[in-house]
Design a protein with these regions (language model features):
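Conserved RecA-like P-loop NTPase helicase motor core
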Residues: 87-185
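Hydrophobic/aromatic residues located in beta-strands of well-ordered beta-sheets
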Residues: 55, 82, 157-159
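Short helix-loop-beta junction
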Residues: 73-80, 188-191
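Short, high-confidence coil segments that cap the C-terminus of an alpha-helix
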Residues: 52-53, 79-80, 105-106, 125
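A conserved SF2-helicase RecA2
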Residues: 1-4, 16-18, 141, 149-216, ...
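Conserved interdomain hinge at the start of the Helicase C-terminal
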Residues: 21-60, 64-75
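Hydrophobic residues at beta-strand termini and immediately following loops
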Residues: 10, 85
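Conserved beta-strand elements of the Class I
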Residues: 56-58, 83, 129
Length: 223
């Protein structure tokens, strides 16, 4: 038996001028642009700092994305223990971090997909954030499996999937297509999902508000 999962698709709509500039970007260039975007970094960091329970933030690139996320989340959540895990962290330290989280609450782990998508069992993981785009079905489902362990401290687990919308006209950006594929995975696995789409400024505004909640999301199919 597994913990029920609720998926929250948080769609970041970029300004029209940005979408136009990125319309013909190669996949690698688009990903580079997104993971180094300062406003995106701030939005994801605020999401992590405000998320409930023990939180796992997953990223792809250590130096240009993971470490800046870790630093900013520490600044935003000084009252919480924030841990960093990548291939640079040895197995003993990873195990110590796992035990801290397993025995605590309101812990935040900022970890690379490669080190945390498989092989680490933390039953009391409450919230997971996909901070980097990922199109691998196996990686997505393995990562989700980290949060589905049963634990008395949770009635469900929450996945925050950050979606980057650079669409303009008929042009659909690479990472948005990958997000559409992830939604197909969620549907196939019968994970209920909600969606909230806001411009970057609106995301910053909503997350800066002390009463802000990611629960304002619009349920799939609703107007």
């Amino acid at each position: 038996q597994l913990t029920p999962l609720k998926v929250k698709l948080c769609v970041l709509k970029y300004p029209e001028t940005t979408c136009r500039d990125m319309r013909k970007a190669l996949y690698q260039d688009e990903v580079e642009f997104l993971v180094t975007h300062p406003v995106r970094l701030e939005i994801v960091s605020r999401m992590a700092a405000r998320a409930k329970g023990n939180v796992l933030v997953l990223f792809n690139f250590v130096d240009k994305h993971g470490k800046p996320l870790y630093q900013r989340i520490q600044e935003l959540a000084p009252e919480r223990d924030v841990h960093f895990v990548s291939g640079e962290v040895d197995a003993d330290d990873r195990e110590r971090i796992r035990q801290w989280v397993a025995n605590g609450d309101r812990q935040i782990i900022v970890a690379s997909y490669g080190t945390f998508s498989t092989g680490i069992n933390i039953p009391n993981l409450h919230t997971m954030i996909f901070a980097s785009p990922s199109k691998s079905k196996i990686r997505v489902l393995q990562s989700i499996g980290r949060s589905l362990r049963l634990h008395e401290s949770k009635t469900h687990a929450t996945l925050i999937d950050v979606v980057d919308d650079l669409r303009i006209g008929v042009a659909v950006n690479h990472t948005f297509r990958h997000a559409e594929q992830r939604v197909q995975y969620y549907s196939m696995e019968s994970f209920p999902y909600t969606m909230l789409e806001l411009g970057l400024d609106r995301w910053l505004e909503s997350l800066a508000n002390a009463s802000a909640s990611l629960q304002h999301s619009k349920t799939k199919g609703e107007e």
